[in-house]
């Protein structure tokens, strides 16, 4: 499914909660009142976006004619929490740009997405613009693909702990690894990449 803006995600969560509590969908006025949207025109705009992105279906002739696509299946809406470079070290951008709903079976402990920038991981089928699902954890095993902070800057690489050093290895033969020798820098694992999601425009 396509990504949601924070406001669209808020509308969708309200629809899900209302359906769970009452067993039927809210009216547009219910949505407007709960989310403090002035008038039903603003609500209609959000519902149109949710329908276009495949999250809901609407029956124009029914004031409560809203149904959730896949309602009853278990899904989770996770934040897209910023950008991480698959390339040279750069500061991470921690700014929620939207949300993406995925089936809970795909979570694998993932808590948030980061949008990948760069092409250093192309041979691991991780492309520029992909969404990497991150499971927060402070440690990693050799060959894990991780988001790591090196002296305060973030990168997405394959992790290797070797004698006297840590190697953050790209999956692109044209790129050089990042080597951090003991005592020469600080490496912190943000989390492990447990899934890659690609949205089509």
UniProtKB/Swiss-Prot annotation:
It comes from the Bacteria. The record marks 86-87 as: Cleavage. InterPro entries: LexA, LexA-like, LexA/Signal_pep-like_sf, LexA_DNA-bd_dom, LexA_repressor, Peptidase_S24_LexA, Peptidase_S24_S26A/B/C, WH-like_DNA-bd_sf. CDD domains: S24_LexA-like. Residues 28-48 bind DNA. Pfam families: LexA_DNA_bind (PF01726), Peptidase_S24 (PF00717). The keyword DNA damage applies. One of its GO terms (biological process) is DNA replication. It catalyses: Hydrolysis of Ala-|-Gly bond in repressor LexA. HAMAP family: LexA. Represses a number of genes involved in the response to DNA damage (SOS response), including recA and lexA. In the presence of single-stranded DNA, RecA interacts with LexA causing an autocatalytic cleavage which disrupts the DNA-binding part of LexA, leading to derepression of the SOS regulon and eventually DNA repair. PANTHER family: LEXA REPRESSOR (PTHR33516), LEXA REPRESSOR-RELATED (PTHR33516:SF2). This is LexA repressor.
């Amino acid at each position: 499914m396509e990504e949601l803006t924070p406001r669209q995600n808020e509308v969708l969560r309200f629809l899900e909660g209302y359906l769970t509590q009452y067993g039927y969908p809210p009216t547009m006025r219910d949505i407007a009142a709960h989310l403090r949207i002035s008038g039903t025109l603003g609500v209609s705009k959000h519902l149109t976006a949710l329908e276009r992105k495949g999250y809901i279906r609407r029956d124009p002739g029914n004031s409560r004619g809203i149904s959730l696509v896949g309602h009853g299946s278990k899904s989770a809406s996770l934040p897209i929490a910023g950008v991480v470079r698959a390339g040279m070290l750069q500061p991470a951008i921690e700014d929620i740009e939207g949300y993406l709903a995925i089936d809970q079976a795909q979570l694998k402990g993932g808590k948030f997405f980061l949008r990948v920038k760069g092409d250093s991981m192309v041979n691991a089928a991780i492309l520029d613009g992909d969404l990497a699902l991150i499971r927060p954890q402070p440690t990693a095993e050799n060959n894990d693909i991780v988001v790591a902070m090196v002296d305060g800057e973030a990168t997405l690489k394959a992790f290797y702990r070797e004698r006297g050093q840590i190697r953050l290895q790209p999956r692109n033969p044209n790129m050089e690894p990042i080597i951090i020798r003991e005592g020469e820098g600080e490496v912190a694992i943000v989390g492990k990449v447990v899934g890659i999601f690609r949205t089509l425009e």
